Design a protein with these regions (language model features):
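Acidic/His-rich, divalent-metal-binding segments that scaffold phosphate/diphosphate chemistry
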Residues: 1-71, 76-79
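Serine/threonine-rich low-complexity intrinsically disordered regions
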Residues: 2-4, 84, 152
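Residue-identity detector for glutamine
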Residues: 9, 43, 58, 127, ...
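Histidine/acidic-rich helix-loop-helix segments that form or flank divalent-metal centers
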Residues: 82-142, 146-147
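Short, aliphatic-rich beta-strand segments
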Residues: 147-164
């Protein structure tokens, strides 16, 4: 099976896993990781690679990794749906390496995922109602009214523009 972002996005099991995961994170007071965040990260990861001139296959893999970036079970789910081993490994490896404390960009897909995830900065991602208990993610997101990513292929730069 070729990578197909639309099929992944419409997959009921994947959608339920994302939403249930967000319910748990919300109960623990963590920043929002709903389907909305997944869709934003997916769109941005694909846009990064597209604007930098990568091939459609890598763009699609980045979009899938962006959408599923909170799904610990991504590899098994993708293999179960018939995705080729090479693609399932690229996606699950990117997901496993996107955490800011332990992760590192090992290929264009993982680099795009890291940038896309960290640039979804907006006040309505904060789920913790108690400002005194905000963690660093809550404080950054709460301060931002809007964020835009500016990708300049000619200058080989990516910038984030925040409206506070």
């Amino acid at each position: 099976m070729k990578p197909d972002f639309k099929a992944i996005q419409e997959d009921k099991e994947i959608s339920l896993l994302i939403e249930k995961g967000n319910e748990v994170l919300k109960a623990l007071g963590y920043t929002e990781h709903s389907r909305r965040h997944a869709a934003k990260v997916s769109q941005t990861a694909g846009e990064i690679l597209e604007k930098l001139g990568y091939k459609d296959k890598q763009i699609e893999l980045a979009r899938i990794a962006g959408y599923m970036h909170g799904a610990i079970l991504a590899y098994g789910i993708l293999k179960e749906r018939g995705m080729a081993l090479e693609y399932a490994l690229t996606i699950s490896t990117a997901i496993g390496h996107h955490d800011e404390k332990t992760g590192t960009a090992i290929d264009p897909v993982s680099a795009a995922l890291i940038l896309a995830d960290k640039t979804d900065v907006r006040r309505n991602r904060v789920q913790n109602p108690n400002q005194a208990q905000f963690d660093i993610h809550d404080r950054v997101n709460y301060a931002a009214l809007k964020s835009d990513l500016i990708i300049d292929r000619e200058k080989n730069t990516i910038q984030i523009k925040l409206e506070l």
